[in-house]
Amino acid sequence: MNQADRALQASQARVYNFSAGPAVLPLEVLEQAKEEMVSWHGSGMSVMEMSHRGREFENILAAAFSDLRQLLAVPDNYEILFLQGGAIAENAIVPLNLMRRLSADAPKADYVVTGTWSVKSQQEARKYGEVNIAATSETERFHKIPDVSSWKLSSDAAYVHLCTNETIVGVEYQETPDVGQAHGRVVVSDVSSHILSRPIDWNGYQVLYGGAQKNIGPAGLTIAIVRKDLLGHAHPLCPSAFNWRLVAENGSMYNTPPTYAIYIAGLVFQWIKRQGGVEALETRNIIKSKMLYDFIDASSFYRNEIHPTCRSRMNVPFFLNDESRSEAFLAQARERGLVQLKGHKSVGGMRASIYNAMPLEGVEALVDFMREFERVSA
């Protein structure tokens, strides 16, 4: 049986997984990992068994760095860091590395709050200095991103923090916000749930970070991309393993990195290149999300509450107008091989996370089911 036949056989037993994270991975990647599980490239070792200092893993790591830089067109004056702890840890790591950049005596940062994750980010940052809420959409239930013209930014803030795709509520910045980066303002963004889904304007962001478990690979790996001149401002009490400068100087191996998660991420990077790169995936993601939103908008049975100008391409929350039918919807969806559609407990309803690895056929199957469920429920 050749690789294509094995992939076809495996696909026939798989479901369409709409989990928000950990999330669906490309089947090709899983098949390759399966083939290489016991002996990577004839080494006689699984990647999980390799020394992170050995030649084999050094090759894996170097390829992952190189491919990610190429895919996102990361400029040479930015450092790519492979870390651990997820975006939750970065909520502390960011202020520990940046908040004292302008003033050690009066550390300060601006935060734009557009959903659950940016709420958590600003709460954590308050442990390390003053936080100014430059804008928030909380009074609108986070259904819309505040217009940039309304943001109240501080002249003495070390950085502006955003979450450019809020996984739970389903809002996404569709444009890079212009907040004066050309005049020295530093913009930091949590991109956990939409990294590699669209190109990045590096004039607009000086630090990006995200957990890998949504759009890159398995849980355990965190990626930060930091402009090099922003390294070296860490708080004296910042743990060494979370000091961006030390991590950069040690090639992301100051401590033992999450080797297998990096290996899988590297396979995903190669898969993205075979798909035509980030630009090709963006086109595909627009098609997938438009298909789902168009169906919801045309229906009197389902609804999406997010303002059309900032709907997420990755995370599509929706509700049944008759919410008493929600459990039946989920149960029948599972019977059709459509899983992990339940919305976050803080929001309710449903949520379809349609990351890069979700094929168009998965979204088509979901829409077909939603149409049929609406018909029989009418």
Curated annotation (Swiss-Prot):
Upper taxonomic lineage: Bacteria, Pseudomonadati, Pseudomonadota, Betaproteobacteria, Burkholderiales
Binding, L-glutamate: 53
Keywords carried by this UniProt record: Amino-acid biosynthesis, Aminotransferase, Cytoplasm, Pyridoxal phosphate, Pyridoxine biosynthesis, Serine biosynthesis, Transferase
One Gene Ontology biological process: L-serine biosynthetic process
Organism name: Ralstonia pickettii (strain 12J)
Record's catalysed reaction(s): O-phospho-L-serine + 2-oxoglutarate = 3-phosphooxypyruvate + L-glutamate; 4-(phosphooxy)-L-threonine + 2-oxoglutarate = (R)-3-hydroxy-2-oxo-4-phosphooxybutanoate + L-glutamate
Subunit structure, interactors included: Homodimer.
InterPro entries given in the database record: Aminotrans_V_dom, Pser_aminoTfrase, PyrdxlP-dep_Trfase, PyrdxlP-dep_Trfase_major, PyrdxlP-dep_Trfase_small
Pathway: Amino-acid biosynthesis; L-serine biosynthesis; L-serine from 3-phospho-D-glycerate: step 2/3; Cofactor biosynthesis; pyridoxine 5'-phosphate biosynthesis; pyridoxine 5'-phosphate from D-erythrose 4-phosphate: step 3/5
Essential cofactor(s): pyridoxal 5'-phosphate
Name by which UniProt lists this protein: Phosphoserine aminotransferase
Cofactor: binding details: Binds 1 pyridoxal phosphate per subunit.
Family stated for the protein in its record: Belongs to the class-V pyridoxal-phosphate-dependent aminotransferase family. SerC subfamily.
